[in-house]
Amino acid sequence: MRFSRTWFRKEVAPVLLALVLVTAARSSLADHYYVPSGSMENTLFAGDRVVVDKTAYGLRIPYTKIDMIEGAHPKPGEVAVFDSPADGVLLIKRIVAVGGQVATMAEGHLAVDGVALESRLFPGSEQFGERLAALNLADGGGPSIEHLVIPAGKLLAIGDHRGNSLDGRYWGLIDERELYGRAVAVYFRKGDGFVWKRL
């Protein structure tokens, strides 16, 4: 059987174009992330699937880290996806402090610029503006932080399961430009099936 150019143009080319557009959109606009561990409990659990807004911190040329349009700067309390500075593995952690802020942590409890973030209304949680982080301190608080000044353009990212998270307390600060996107919502949770839980 012989295939003509007309057949290729009508049948194959549209499918190839659609595949290229879908993969480019996943690279630059939105994607999903599978949570591999419990380092973000009690906010995210192992097996959760999360929608990631890749335009939150800027619109990039597909498959690169080159910004076409600059986006918002990350804010404390946001949950972000980025590569680990230690080994390049894709991670999801909470941004707890950004450039110009000073972070301290004792027994898993965070203070930023001298203000403790522990929620009075919801014990075991921390308040980041309107965002509430439900912590897991069952394994202790992990390493402490003493007066860490965050330089401009950098940020501190830490897991909500403070005693069971390999995070910025181990590998240090990350550059804002290294963020792939902001986690928006959990869309699938083991045991519950499809859900929509905003982060």
Q: Could you describe each region identified by the protein language model?
A:
Residues 2-9, 24, 28-199:
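Soluble "head" domains of membrane/secretory-pathway proteins
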